Curated annotation (Swiss-Prot):
<dbReference type="GO" id="GO:0015935">
    <property type="term" value="C:small ribosomal subunit"/>
</dbReference>
<dbReference type="Pfam" id="PF00203">
    <property type="entry name" value="Ribosomal_S19"/>
</dbReference>
<keyword id="KW-0699">rRNA-binding</keyword>
<dbReference type="InterPro" id="IPR005732">
    <property type="entry name" value="Ribosomal_uS19_bac-type"/>
</dbReference>
<dbReference type="GO" id="GO:0006412">
    <property type="term" value="P:translation"/>
</dbReference>
<keyword id="KW-0694">RNA-binding</keyword>
<dbReference type="GO" id="GO:0000028">
    <property type="term" value="P:ribosomal small subunit assembly"/>
</dbReference>
<protein>
    <recommendedName>
        <fullName>Small ribosomal subunit protein uS19</fullName>
    </recommendedName>
</protein>
<dbReference type="GO" id="GO:0019843">
    <property type="term" value="F:rRNA binding"/>
</dbReference>
<dbReference type="InterPro" id="IPR020934">
    <property type="entry name" value="Ribosomal_uS19_CS"/>
</dbReference>
<dbReference type="GO" id="GO:0003735">
    <property type="term" value="F:structural constituent of ribosome"/>
</dbReference>
<dbReference type="InterPro" id="IPR002222">
    <property type="entry name" value="Ribosomal_uS19"/>
</dbReference>
<dbReference type="GO" id="GO:0005737">
    <property type="term" value="C:cytoplasm"/>
</dbReference>
<comment type="function">
    <text>Protein S19 forms a complex with S13 that binds strongly to the 16S ribosomal RNA.</text>
</comment>
<comment type="similarity">
    <text>Belongs to the universal ribosomal protein uS19 family.</text>
</comment>
<dbReference type="InterPro" id="IPR023575">
    <property type="entry name" value="Ribosomal_uS19_SF"/>
</dbReference>
<keyword id="KW-0689">Ribosomal protein</keyword>
Amino acid sequence: MARSLKKGPFIDDHLMKKITKLNSEGKKTPFKSWSRRSTIYPDMIGHTVMIHNGKAFVPVYVNENMIGHKLGEFAPTRTFKGHGGDKKVAKK
């Protein structure tokens, strides 16, 4: 279910403070964030955010096409090992 338009996008306050501080200083250093639920907004373009996937931090470089999506969409939490192979044993 989509978020109501009257509410607007959700951004954690601590993440907003980090971005505004980096933008005011003119720095583009990567920073860690556990906030997978925050929406990507235009001030984040050009920054590298290290998103936690439950085990490690995944570097995500933010560009224009990501605006409006959640940060967690770009840091997968599950590793796909592949479907089962052919279980038939070949006769020799």
